[in-house]
Regions:
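C-terminal regions of RecA-like/P-loop NTPase motor modules
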Residues: 1-12, 36-45, 58-154
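Flexible loop residues that form catalytic
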Residues: 17, 55, 90
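Helical hairpin unit composed of two closely spaced alpha helices linked by a short loop
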Residues: 9-51
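Short, active-site-adjacent cap segments at secondary-structure transitions
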Residues: 19-21, 56-59
Length: 154
């Protein structure tokens, strides 16, 4: 809040939500309270908050390993408070024989003021970044995102 008063606050990044603590009776309530407080803080200081969250192990147990909103760990409140929820999915993590090596899906499952969908990007893991796929890349999509559509990332 001190930075916001000085006009020096453009973005708040939390890596990751479950590392934060407040006094509460249960971990579920604690994460819910943290999520609500971050939402209020973002509105108060007029700065966007990007909060990374751990996922539960449920997606590891499914055939389709793509994460969804119910996989957010320890609280459904995160889903309620978030304006945008985006997951990163890399098929090569689960299938070393995939033809989609070096690619990632950015899956937007909630976008309060926009469209949900999936963006396919190339990965440059050695530089910790994504980039647009070049024309010579082919992405074999095995299952489209329900309710959304694929988009080109600009």
């Amino acid at each position: 809040r001190r930075y916001a008063r000085n006009g020096n606050l453009g973005l708040i990044v939390i890596d990751y939500l479950q590392l934060m603590t407040v006094k509460s009776n249960s971990r579920f309530d604690e994460v819910s309270q943290i999520s609500r407080q971050l939402k209020v803080m973002a509105k108060t200081v007029k700065a966007p908050v990007i909060a990374l969250s751990q996922l539960s192990r449920k997606c590891e147990e499914r055939g389709d390993k793509r994460p969804n909103n119910s996989d957010l760990r320890e609280s459904g409140q995160i889903e309620q408070d978030a304006d945008i929820i985006t997951f990163i999915y890399r098929e090569e993590v689960y299938n070393d024989k995939t033809v989609n090596k070096g690619m990632a899906e950015l899956i937007t499952t909630k976008f309060r003021n926009g469209e949900i969908g999936k963006d396919i990007l190339a990965t440059e893991l050695q530089f910790c970044r994504f980039k647009n796929l070049s024309a010579d890349f082919y992405y074999k999509e095995d299952e489209p995102l329900a309710g959304g559509k694929s988009r080109k990332f600009d």
